[in-house]
């Protein structure tokens, strides 16, 4: 179903396709934990990261190696011919000749789709500015499936909903599962109107609030995001909203016992470390789930 296919946006996937990816990820979880595999032996994955990354870069690299493949890295833009003025299109054409697939993270929205236009091999979007982050969304859905439930879910997306690409992608995907979505943010960091409009047209129930206390006792999942400092054109505005939400043990009094707290990481001040040891915290398991999910994508796209 995904053979030789680009992974650019969650809007490109049906629920049936997502379910197949999640089922494949579950079957690969033992391999993600160390069981050997050689199904992608001889395949090469190119990692092109023009923005900082820890989890996405390392989990893709781990996923490829767990499947018996290898990776090559661009390094930084400053250390490549891009620093000499080479266009992204030309760089993609060249790298596509060295690898069987390309993972790209870039600060400009639409960059992954542009890369796909010129690439001779499949392109996987690892984040394009404030646009989309589909592989993060797939691991988020896998986490929700493992730790809670996907159907009839009540979820609060909290924090920077304007610049946070993870919540943009996740909102679209959740609409396929009939979720009730609460959007919790400062007024200046609201979810873009286009996305809210798209969700409404898809029949998704969406409610916007600024006070997390209004919804924290009602939801099954809290999806917390950091304020995206690097996206702010004005540092004064960033400082004004930087500590808008910070979850502590006290905030969890009276919540559902089965509440699960997620975060795409890295966190800054959004979740107190005291929450880490509660039954509600699943964000470190969430980070691990990136390995089997990305293994599933690579297997489905590249396996002969």
Swiss-Prot record:
Purpose of the protein: Catalyzes the condensation of carbamoyl phosphate and aspartate to form carbamoyl aspartate and inorganic phosphate, the committed step in the de novo pyrimidine nucleotide biosynthesis pathway.
Domain of life: Archaea
Annotated organism of origin: Methanothrix thermoacetophila (strain DSM 6194 / JCM 14653 / NBRC 101360 / PT)
Known catalytic reactions: carbamoyl phosphate + L-aspartate = N-carbamoyl-L-aspartate + phosphate + H(+)
Oligomeric form and interacting partners: Heterooligomer of catalytic and regulatory chains.
Cellular component GO terms held in the UniProt record: cytosol
Binding site for L-aspartate: 84, 165, 226
SUPFAM superfamilies (alphabetical): Aspartate/ornithine carbamoyltransferase
Pathway involvement of the protein, from the record: Pyrimidine metabolism; UMP biosynthesis via de novo pathway; (S)-dihydroorotate from bicarbonate: step 2/3
Matches recorded under HAMAP family: Asp_carb_tr
Homology family: Belongs to the aspartate/ornithine carbamoyltransferase superfamily. ATCase family.
Single biological process term from Gene Ontology: amino acid metabolic process
Residues annotated to bind carbamoyl phosphate: 55-56, 105, 133, 136, 265-266
Enzyme class: transferase
Entries under InterPro entries matching the protein: Asp/Orn_carbamoyltranf_P-bd, Asp/Orn_carbamoylTrfase, Asp/Orn_carbamoylTrfase_sf, Asp_carbamoyltransf, Asp_carbamoyltransf_Asp/Orn-bd
Protein name: Aspartate carbamoyltransferase catalytic subunit
Keywords annotated in UniProt: Pyrimidine biosynthesis, Transferase
E.C. numbers: 2.1.3.2
The organism's taxonomic lineage, starting at the top: Archaea, Methanobacteriati, Methanobacteriota, Stenosarchaea group, Methanomicrobia
GO MF, one example: amino acid binding
């Amino acid at each position: 179903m995904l053979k030789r296919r680009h992974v650019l946006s969650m809007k490109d996937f049906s629920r049936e396709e997502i379910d197949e990816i999640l089922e494949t990820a579950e079957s690969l979880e033992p391999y993600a934990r160390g069981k050997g595999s050689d199904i992608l032996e001889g395949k090469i994955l190119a990692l092109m990261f023009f923005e900082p990354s820890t989890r996405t870069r390392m989990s893709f690299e781990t996923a490829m190696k767990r499947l018996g493949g290898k990776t090559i890295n661009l390094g930084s833009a400053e250390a490549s011919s891009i620093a000499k003025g080479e266009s992204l299109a030309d760089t993609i054409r060249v790298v596509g000749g060295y690898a069987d697939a390309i993972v790209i993270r870039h600060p400009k929205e639409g960059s992954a789709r542009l890369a796909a236009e010129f690439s001779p091999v499949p392109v996987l979007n690892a984040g394009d500015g404030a646009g989309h982050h589909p592989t993060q969304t797939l691991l988020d859905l896998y986490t929700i499936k493992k730790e809670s439930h996907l159907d009839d879910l009540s979820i609060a997306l909290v924090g920077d909903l304007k610049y946070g690409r993870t919540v943009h992608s996740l909102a679209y995907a959740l609409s396929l599962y009939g979720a009730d979505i609460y959007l919790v943010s400062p007024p200046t960091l609201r979810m873009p109107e286009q996305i809210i409009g798209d969700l409404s047209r898809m029949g998704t129930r969406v409610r916007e609030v600024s006070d997390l206390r209004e919804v924290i006792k009602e939801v099954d999942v809290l999806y917390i995001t950091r304020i995206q400092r690097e996206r702010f054109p004005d540092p004064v505005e960033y400082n004004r909203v930087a500590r808008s939400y910070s979850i502590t043990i006290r905030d969890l009094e009276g919540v559902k016992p089965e509440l699960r707290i997620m975060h795409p990481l890295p966190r800054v001040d959004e979740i107190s470390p005291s929450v880490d040891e509660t039954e509600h915290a699943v964000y470190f398991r969430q980070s691990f789930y990136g390995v089997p999910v990305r293994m599933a994508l690579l297997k489905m796209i590249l396996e002969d």
